[in-house]
Amino acid sequence: MSPEEIKAIRAGVRMSRTVFAHKFQLSIDTVKGWEQGKRQPDAAAANFLRLIKAGPQFVLDALAT
């Protein structure tokens, strides 16, 4: 998953990097690293990002329980 794809997912949910990281229980440094191309999400993280893209509210609801 490219940095551009990750940025597009975050832009699609209209959240700042800080809010995105907090709401989806991710480290801000991790999200920043992914978006800057310094880190690459592993398979599980890439799948999680795809879930966020497909159904952000579903993921937020699941994390809230």
Regions found by a protein language model. Name each.
Residues 1-12, 50:
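A short, Lys/Arg-rich alpha-helix, primarily the initiator
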Residues 7, 23-25, 36:
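Short amphipathic alpha-helical segments, especially helix-boundary/capping motifs
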Residues 14-32:
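Short alpha-helical DNA-recognition segment
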Residues 21, 36-65:
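Short, Lys/Arg-rich amphipathic alpha-helical interaction segments
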